[in-house]
Amino acid sequence: MDIKKRIDELRKIIEYHNDKYYNQDDPEITDYEYDKLYVELRNLENSHPEYKIQSSPTQKVGGTVKRELRKVKHDIPVVSLQDVFSKEEVYSFVEKITSEVTYPKFVVEKKIDGLTVVLRYYNGELKEAITRGDGSIGESVFENILQVKSIPKHIPSKLNYLEIRGEIYMTNENFIKVNEKQEEIGGKIFKNPRNLAAGTIRQLDTSIVKDRNLDIFIFNLEISEGKKFETHSETLEWLSNQGFDVSPNFKICETADEVWNAILDIEESRWDLGYSIDGAVVKVDNLNDRISLGMTSKVPKWTVAFKYPPEQKETVIEDIIVQVSRTGRLNPLALLRPVILANTTISKATLHNQDFIDSKDIRIGDTVIIQKAGDIIPEIIRSIPEKRPDWAKKYIIPDVCPVCNSKTIREPDGVDTRCSNPDCEAQSFRKIGYFVSKDAMNIVGFGQNTVEALMKDGYIKKISDIYILKNYKDALIEKGIIGKEKSVNNLLNAIELSKDNDIDRLITGLGIRNVGKQSAKILAGNFKSMDELAGAAYEQLIELEDFGPTTVPDILEFFNSNAYIELIKKLKEAGVNTISKTLQKKIDNRFLGKTFVITGTLPTMKRDEAAEIIQSFGGKVSGSVSKRTSFVLAGEEAGSKLTKAQQLGISIITEEDLKDMIK
């Protein structure tokens, strides 16, 4: 093997994956696979120091600072940990520490799979939050951190300065909910909770952060001016008493055997935690011992991270089927011979699209390796060609829809295949279900089972049929397909009530690709009616906050379709409101052309309430401060947005000022 060539190759591969992981939040390989590449490079460099260079990935932290967020210098560099993968390496670490420190104790904690943040408190008040970035300079995410409920904004202790580190993460339950909503709007499906948590905390729109319910575990106290501690475990107890969620169920150990057993205990429980971990961290407990042990050029000598390999199993693809989504996307699904993986029975896994199937050479009958992405979603890692039976069949996504037999089309600039028939029964079922859902028209009692029953008996085939169900009241009661008379009356009353919804709910319910609740509210606040919105030009839409070159063409295509023109005509005939109540409520347009940014905690109003008031007078509410911002409405704990507004000379107003402005 050409050592120099392999080292150069590994550096390029690792730099590529560093960028995908740290800066794009879209890793292509598992942490375990990455760690193996990294260890190979590190070992080669150690064996051949003549090839070691300062710019190597082994000599620096992987990320760079995202351009859109304010840069903040770290008081203490945020460095990586030394990874270990075997029992022998763990014992070697403990023995080395024992040879340098008298009677050391070790703390073993779960290694949460999330995004590290540094929190700064001044006199008990949270004032700053910073991501790791490149280890020396991070990015301020203070406004977003305020949306994380498990982070105290005030603590009992009034230390002059407190700096702590924690891991932002998303529970498995919330991750599934977010992906379900993304599926409903035809948006991006996230690979795992870590990617989603990392991408969310870097959002420029705080409302998105609030909706996604992030959490945090605090794992280290860095600076505590005015208070001294002897051990790490003591700091965790103190932080817990201050209201922080600290690394859960950590163990204090004295021997290598105890440390190893603690690591095994964590591994055994990892599938029942409700959130993702990718290892266990072993730390020297005594803080003075940590100082004496010091660090290498890159990692602390007093700690290591033991990385668990992802649990993988072999199984067989017994068949491949296609499901049709609400937006018409054909989703190939592998039906697997059932296998127990991470304490659950796995019998299917998504194959995403034709490119995915082809790149992995996946065939019906293949034996495949599967694991859970982020410990949640089953994914096929690779097929095993040497175990392929002679009869194994290549799979091609059909050129006709499996539900309605209409022609399918491959998106010219994408990887998805879609059904060309907007009236496809599979699409109609999901479209109707989404239209009546809580996030859209909120028709109480109109669940998926009701949709299925009414479609099966031919009472509804498309969205507009919902509003003529009252014509079949007697038949519905007689047949009892959705319950007795009271149930029928309740449903019909709920349908009538929905006619009076504001148009943001109607826009949401239409299921336009890449348009969810937040986008629908912006549209309803900028167009006085559905007709005006349908006639909007590209130039008008692209100027709206958070509407980009991906979303706007989808909106234009939808409103120019014959299907929409027919649907809106029938909805109007049924009496469904198509006028923006948000704009109707305007007393005047005194804020027309003005852009407001709301930051901090207001004395009596919620931010959403303040935003509605501003919008009702013609103003626009933005999630970020720029030269185009007219006013910043600031409450308590106003952070980086207030600072930027002051630097730009933008007018700062209070809640009282806003009230005076609308008198």
Curated annotation (Swiss-Prot):
Needed co-factor(s): Mg(2+); Mn(2+)
Catalytic activity reported: NAD(+) + (deoxyribonucleotide)n-3'-hydroxyl + 5'-phospho-(deoxyribonucleotide)m = (deoxyribonucleotide)n+m + AMP + beta-nicotinamide D-nucleotide
Species in which this protein is naturally found: Clostridium kluyveri (strain ATCC 8527 / DSM 555 / NBRC 12016 / NCIMB 10680 / K1)
EC number, as in UniProt: 6.5.1.2
Name of the featured protein: DNA ligase
Lineage: Bacteria, Bacillati, Bacillota, Clostridia, Eubacteriales
Domain BRCT: start-end pairs: 586-663
UniProt-annotated binding residues for NAD(+): 31-35, 80-81, 109, 132, 167, 283, 307
CDD domains: LIGANc
